[in-house]
Every structure is written in C-alpha cells, then in structure tokens.
Design a protein with these regions (language model features):
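TPR-adjacent "capping" and linker segments in tetratricopeptide-repeat scaffold/adaptor proteins
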Residues: 1-8, 112, 125-127
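Structural signature of tandem alpha-helical TPR/SEL1-like repeats
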Residues: 18-28, 53-65, 87-99
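TPR/TPR-like (Sel1-like) alpha-helical repeat modules
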Residues: 67-74, 78, 82-109
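Alpha-helical segment of the N-proximal tetratricopeptide repeat
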Residues: 4-31, 35
Length: 128
C-alpha cells in the first residue's frame, strides 16, 4: 500500500471516529497502519477509538505500543492514564498521569527555565 493510500485510510478513520463509529474507525486505522505500522498518530487514534468503544484492554495495549515507540510522548502517557482510569485501575492511571506531567514539565523547561514542577497526582482540577 502506498503512503498516499495510508493517508486516505487515516483521514477516513478520523471521520468515522468523529461520527462515533468506533469499530469502523479501528478498521480504517488498521488499514492505514498496514503501510506505516509505527505511525503514532494512527496508533493514538486507534487507541482512542478502542477506548470509546469500551475496549479498554485493547486501548491500553496500543497505548503501550506508542510508549515503546516514543517513551517521551506525554500524550501517550496521558491517554494510558485515561484508559486505566476508565478500566478502574486507578493506581496505574496515577502512575501514567505522573509520567505525563513530568514529561510535559520537562518540555516546558526548554521554553521556560523557571517553570514550576508539576504537583502530585490529584493536584489539578480535572473536568470529566
């Protein structure tokens, strides 16, 4: 499959996801990933579609794959935190959330050396 075809499948997956068609979105993400198996944007989308469809174990599996590919991706850790929380695994959710906060802080330090460190888990107001 060409990279252009993979991009088309990815765009279709985004559309389906936006329409709440999670199963079909996952199928389109799978097609996109056939050409580019390490495409983290598509993996992120697939994980979200799995989670929104109630398939939290699959979402966690894909989230872990993203972390394997890019351990410094704060969004991957944030997503894993959310997936664990939805599954009721609060301790794991907090661990991943802490990793995400620390990675985001390190990125902020590159732009703002005086940025304060992140607070402990639960120190931010989260709207669900």
């Amino acid at each position: 499959m060409s990279e252009e075809a993979a991009q088309q499948h990815y765009l279709e997956a985004l559309k389906l996801f936006g329409e709440g068609k999670n199963v079909q979105a996952v199928e389109a993400y799978e097609k996109a990933l056939e050409a580019k198996p390490d495409w983290t944007d598509a993996l992120h989308g697939m994980a979200m579609a799995y989670s929104n469809g109630g398939r939290h174990d699959d979402a966690i599996r894909i989230g872990k794959r993203i972390v394997e590919l890019d351990s410094n991706d704060p969004f991957a850790h944030t997503s894993l935190s959310m997936f664990y929380q939805r599954k009721g695994e609060i301790e794991e959710a907090e661990k991943e959330g802490a990793k995400a906060r620390m990675l985001s802080w390190k990125e902020e330090l590159k732009k703002n050396p005086d940025a304060p460190p992140p607070g402990p888990a639960g120190s931010m107001d989260v709207i669900q």
